[in-house]
From Swiss-Prot:
Designated name of the protein: Large ribosomal subunit protein bL28
Gene: rpmB
Pfam families: Ribosomal_L28
Species this protein is from: Treponema pallidum (strain Nichols)
Coiled coil start-end: none
Highest taxon in the source lineage: Bacteria
């Protein structure tokens, strides 16, 4: 699976990390992807979206649990 945002398409980029002594090391910057269950057109989908899209897009809301789903009770400790 690609390391890419499902909404904006943000992916990994590569470049050089430059230290204080101007030493260049190759490195990779990766987006902050989160696996989220989102409601799109009335149906819930699993998507990997970046944190910026999740924070900034008011239409992207996490899917709520079903109203008629039974709640799981904690098992008693013995």
């Amino acid at each position: 699976m690609a390391r890419r945002c499902g909404l904006c398409g943000k992916g990994t980029i590569s470049g050089c990390a430059v230290s204080k002594s101007m030493h260049h090391c190759k490195r990779v910057w990766k987006p902050n992807l989160l696996a989220v269950r989102v409601v799109v057109d009335g149906s819930a989908l699993n998507m990997r979206i970046c944190a910026r899209c999740l924070r900034s897009n008011p239409l992207m809301k996490k899917a709520q649990p079903r109203a008629n789903a039974p709640l799981r009770a904690a098992a008693p400790k013995l």
